[in-house]
Amino acid sequence: MQLNSTEISELIKQRIAQFNVVSEAHNEGTIVSVSDGIIRVHGLADVMQGEMIALPGNRYAIALNLERDSVGAVVMGPYADLAEGMKVKCTGRILEVPVGRGLLGRVVNTLGEPVDGKGPVENDGFSAVEAIAPGVIERQSVDEPVQTGYKSVDAMIPIGRGQRELIIGDRQTGKTALAIDAIINQRDSGIKCVYVAIGQKASTVANVVRKLEEHGALANTIVVVATASESAALQYLAPYSGCAMGEYFRDRGEDALIIYDDLSKQAVAYRQISLLLRRPPGREAYPGDVFYLHSRLLERAARVNADYVEAFTKGEVKGKTGSLTALPIIETQAGDVSAFVPTNVISITDGQIFLESSLFNAGIRPAVNPGISVSRVGGAAQTKIMKKLSGGIRTALAQYRELAAFSQFASDLDDATRKQLSHGQKVTELLKQKQYAPMSVAQQSLVLFAAERGYLGDIELAKVGSFEAALLAFADREHAELLQQINQTGAYNDEIEAKLKGILDTFKATQSW
């Protein structure tokens, strides 16, 4: 057999031309220790703070401690099969979660994966869990209300779109109930809701989801869950994931409401991670940056102006402002609002609704303490009619509390003082409300008008509740158009005042309560 050198050289050239070498450089490291969900890695020289590190088995860890000779990272999910010597890689990405309308009506975990058994989640893309809050120039002042459906809150502690209002109180004082009712009340308001459950029992979350479904509010709500059985890393990141999902609506000129239930458990999870990473502990063993943990989250709740929305949507949405309203929940121990985390969150938020165990146990529910509850946005976020009618309620309750304390020591009281005490008791009774029964603006206005104009004077204290129920039923039956008008416009003028007076005069004449 004769070898032709030309043929051989051609064949070699052909093979060389077809030879395809793809060189891929990636930063690789080695696990040197695994304990309590924390891994220490050698060799990741170029890793960034907060970067996702790819682990064997399609899992990830997040780099939190960048030290001279190693990287401390927290594992997202189970870590039992990770061992010393395993190879890990940098990804060059930070954690992102799916966002979009497809998430409405779904229950997802911190990573945006469905946990409700309804199949895969449709999304409009992904968004980073950590985002920079809108700047000063991009914001607009808060002047539109978010109606919670609670008389005591909407009258005395009004919440505006884009506000951060803290709900604070001991365990079992109705904090979650208040937040869930606020979500239920947004059924027809166009406000999209996000409920973030942090460190709660799975049975409690299932109950909340069932209640939202029963009241027709789940369809416009995203539920983000990091239960008590999940890792500290997932509990720490859950609020940021929920916030990214809420920002999707804010940045497109829509209104959204987000509930963080509760941030005390998130702070505990973050404390656990920090101590395991051997960061120096501070007050109550929390790390030094626990204030920043909450401030960077809550600053993302804002009302953004039309220019911001137009720039974000590249001109698709014009002339619309967007908002993300936050209702963070904090659990106190024995009413101590001066503890570390409660004082931090109080100083970050635009007001707080303080729920008291003593009021709750006395049957005053919602157990709002009007003395130390405040909204720093105030009347700017109220409808005209609520602003006009609610002014005297807070004053009446403040005077009542003062006189009630004084009357314990005084044996004989004059008529004026007795009248004020009686009025205060009736207003307190009137502000009671059952769970899952939010009220419209018109219904609240009618009830407040009755209290403000002295229509409760001759009603027995025990009959105030039945008087209110009968009055609302009468108004719904006989004056539905007026109630509809008030709900749509929120206006208050002499004509509406005369009509409200007419309703109450006619109703009181019937004596049907």
Swiss-Prot record:
Localization terms from the record: Cell inner membrane
Residue ranges of the TM segments: none
Gene: atpA
Keywords linked to the UniProt accession: ATP synthesis, ATP-binding, Cell inner membrane, Cell membrane, CF(1), Hydrogen ion transport, Ion transport, Membrane, Nucleotide-binding, Translocase, Transport
Source species taxonomy: Bacteria, Pseudomonadati, Pseudomonadota, Gammaproteobacteria, Enterobacterales
Designated name of the protein: ATP synthase subunit alpha
Main location: membrane
Membrane association type: Peripheral membrane protein
Pfam families xrefs: ATP-synt_ab (PF00006), ATP-synt_ab_C (PF00306), ATP-synt_ab_N (PF02874)
Source organism (scientific name): Yersinia enterocolitica serotype O:8 / biotype 1B (strain NCTC 13174 / 8081)
Record-linked InterPro entries: ATP_synth_asu-like_sf (IPR023366), ATP_synth_asu_C (IPR000793), ATP_synth_asu_C_sf (IPR038376), ATP_synth_F1_a_nt-bd_dom (IPR033732), ATP_synth_F1_asu (IPR005294), ATPase_a/bsu_AS (IPR020003), ATPase_F1/V1/A1_a/bsu_N (IPR004100), ATPase_F1/V1/A1_a/bsu_N_sf (IPR036121)
GO molecular function, one term: proton-transporting ATP synthase activity, rotational mechanism
Subunit: F-type ATPases have 2 components, CF(1) - the catalytic core - and CF(0) - the membrane proton channel. CF(1) has five subunits: alpha(3), beta(3), gamma(1), delta(1), epsilon(1). CF(0) has three main subunits: a(1), b(2) and c(9-12). The alpha and beta chains form an alternating ring which encloses part of the gamma chain. CF(1) is attached to CF(0) by a central stalk formed by the gamma and epsilon chains, while a peripheral stalk is formed by the delta and b chains.
Catalytic activity: ATP + H2O + 4 H(+)(in) = ADP + phosphate + 5 H(+)(out)
Gene3D superfamilies: 2.40.30.20, ATP synthase alpha/beta chain, C-terminal domain, P-loop containing nucleotide triphosphate hydrolases
Record keyword ATP-binding present: yes
Site (Required for activity): S373
